Amino acid sequence: QRQMCIRDRYMSYAHGYYAFPKLEGDIGPHMTFRGKKMLNWSLNNYLGLANHPEVRKADAEGAAQFGMAAPMGARMMSGQTVYHEQLERELAEFVGKEDAFLLNFGYQGMISIIDCLLTPRDVVVYDAEAHACIIDGLRLHKGKRFVYGHNDMDSLRLQLQHATDLAEEQKGGVLVITEGVFGMKGDLGKLDEIVALKKDFQFRLLVDDAHGFGTMGEGGRGTASHFGVTDGVDVLFNTFAKSMAGIGAFVCGPRWLVNLLRYNMRSQLYAKSLPMPMVIGALKRLELIRNHPEYQQKLWEIVRVLQSSLKENGFEIGVTNSPVTPVFLKGGIPEATNLVVDLRENHGIFCSMVVYPVIPKGEIIPVSYTHLTLPTTSR
């Protein structure tokens, strides 16, 4: 009861400012918070597609033509359209996989993928810093799981040996799960080294590339493309919520595996089909990413200037080698709240913070992005 009282007091104090703040205006480098125009550091609109005129036009036309209700029903029953199929074909072709399956949401989609792929006899080996959606998916797994040290290939090899022995005993398989780009630190999963371990161990590899799709690899094809190991990734998951500036996700791989997911993923079997405006909008976003590699090139120009400037000004950005740009500071919740207030009230900068338990105790990460205001950001 005491903990509930503390929680309730915190929620009452924090709501609307530290938690659930309301940003207003067009999505961009400057937005309005509590009536004041601010430089916005808290966006993941990597390629700037959120307000692209062709994207806004496609979204509006999709809504005008079909409304938000169509198609009615789950895809297996009455929610299938030629547009859903077209988007799946184009996504699979773009990332270099045989087939793809659309998902309504990224977070619950990943949970359902893991639930669908595994039996109690199967064994999972996953990175210690895997995203919360992966952890929640593994909570549904009734079999054994092993965690390896973040990006530590010696640790992975050791856990793979344990997993292999157990899987052979149980007559199951081994699934390794990692990320293409880790969203808190910005470092890349060592996909090339993980794929190389297939020479010594039998396992399938599932990669969550939410932050890599559109930003990494040839033309934005993702982190597996960056490492040249697309064929070695068995199950590739991507979301529309980052580079695509939309909603939804997709999973891709060999056709037999995608069909297994298509006919068995509970989050899709028992859910309404992705609404038509989202599908029409995603087709336009993919077209722009595919036909305009300069969007990715511009992103990386900004990233290089931003990260170099931050380091030159004495900020610790860790080991990021992606557009994710964390700034590591020492402190806990009191220091983080003071910093949020200082940035917003005294400097006109809207910024959100990440603290323990999302990151190690005693650290703070301002979640930050900026497109057009690099000098102000670095200062």
Feature-to-residue mapping (PLM):
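Conserved small/polar residues in nucleotide/adenosyl-binding loops
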Residues: 1-9, 370-377
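N-terminal "arm"/small-domain region of PLP-dependent enzymes with the aminotransferase-like
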Residues: 7-69, 203
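Conserved PLP-binding catalytic core of the aspartate aminotransferase-like
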Residues: 19, 297-307, 311-347, 363
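PLP-dependent enzyme catalytic core of the Aspartate aminotransferase-like
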Residues: 53, 57, 61, 65, ...
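Conserved N-terminal alpha-helix of the aminotransferase class I/II PLP-enzyme fold
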Residues: 57, 64-105
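Conserved PLP-anchoring active-site segment centered on the Schiff-base-forming lysine
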Residues: 113-132
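Active-site phosphate-binding strand-loop segment of PLP-dependent enzymes
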Residues: 146, 150-207
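Conserved core segment of the aminotransferase class I/II
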Residues: 235-237, 244-296
